[in-house]
Swiss-Prot record:
Pfam family, one: OMPdecase
Enzymatic reactions: 3-dehydro-L-gulonate 6-phosphate + H(+) = L-xylulose 5-phosphate + CO2
Subunit structure of this chain's protein: Homodimer.
Similarity comment text for this entry: Belongs to the HPS/KGPDC family. KGPDC subfamily.
Amino-acid positions noted as binding substrate in the UniProt annotation, renumbered to this chain: 11, 202
Annotated source species: Haemophilus influenzae (strain ATCC 51907 / DSM 11121 / KW20 / Rd)
PANTHER family, alphabetized: 3-KETO-L-GULONATE-6-PHOSPHATE DECARBOXYLASE SGBH-RELATED
Protein name, UniProt field: Probable 3-keto-L-gulonate-6-phosphate decarboxylase
Gene name tied to this protein: sgbH
Amino acid sequence: MGKPLLQIALDAQYLETALVDVKQIEHNIDIIEVGTILACSEGMRAVRILRALYPNQILVCDLKTTDAGATLAKMAFEAGADWLTVSAAAHPATKAACQKVAEEFNKIQPNLGVPKEIQIELYGNWNFDEVKNWLQLGIKQAIYHRSRDAELSGLSWSNQDIENIEKLDSLGIELSITGGITPDDLHLFKNTKNLKAFIAGRALVGKSGREIAEQLKQKIGQFWI
């Protein structure tokens, strides 16, 4: 794979706030995520408006889908999302339904610049056998989260985190990594071959958002040539 991409998670409750947040760093990011809170508050309107405003960036709808997979996937993709998140806790049938919808969209529109894809959110209980099953379904992407408690406690990425990421990488799944990512963290993942993106939310909003985005891009350029 090429260089990892940089993704902003828009976790504001209101679209007006999210639009201000993304505007200040629009030239430094590759992926825009309609976060779960924003999607619940504003619905697919947020996806449609961001798609219209940013046609050249990858757009993620972070629904953390756990049920009604086919319906939610269709809603997100029709609104303009490129990727849809599905919870690792979702029933296998839900994951399969979401993947089927993505494949149907790609078949109907074979020349899409960014194919529709499913991302599995690695929250809660999951195991590597399940990851193999997802790959067999055709799902290529997953999102690895550092422990929320560890993040809030100011703890760094653990050896277990790195081991998990290395094993996921060896299976061939494309990983996005999140959980309080800072520029100083990026060197920990420089040997990850299938690294899709780094995701940051709070770090990229506010007065220092643009500066942090530039630092993250600089580190990506340093470690991935």
